[in-house]
Amino acid sequence: MRDELLAAVDAARDEIIELCQALVRVPSINTGVMPTGNETPAARILQEKLAADGIASEILESAPNRGNFIAQLAGTAGTPRLLYLSHTDVVPVEDEGAWTHPPFGAEIHEGRIYGRGSNDMKNTVAAEAMAMIILKRAGVPLRGDLVFAAGADEESGGKWGFAWRAEHHPEKLRGDFGINEGGGALVQAADGRRAYLVS
């Protein structure tokens, strides 16, 4: 199965790149001052992409245009539950004239996608979405649930993103394990459990 999945990833290379480019083209700039963010268009791109492979999802708006995306592949036992965690907002473009390539052009030069968010972290958002799609296409039997959550407002503290979701939809974020961009720190959950982030 491993070799088949790796071959499926290779076969989906162009699709992964195109999804990343589509996400980078969304100017989901988070200044930290409302109204800001514009994450809902990125969430809609994800929703359409996953729906094409029969994966249902939701966009939960914490405020107008502050879309928090979530999708799930159900496992046979439900647990352990693995969360893919990422965000679709980006930091502001301070001096567009200093950019070699347009910040929301998602142009490819020398094998790299250039644009705001191409490294933090729309590349990971695209990879997580496509990992879920490839697992679904391959018919991989999952024991536990796989949840893909791409949040708003990470670049400005998370009030309209994962913090909002944890307050209003905590059941959608429950998990046994999570894969995120961070790592190395001890964190304490609201219920008192502690965990180390591993990167």
Protein language model annotation of sequence segments:
Residues R2-R116, R137-R143:
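Acidic/His- and Gly-rich active-site-bordering loop/insert found
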Residues N119-S199:
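Acidic/histidine-rich catalytic neighborhood of metal-dependent amide-processing enzymes
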Residues M1-A11, F177-N180, L186-V187:
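Solvent-exposed, charged interface segments at domain starts and junctions
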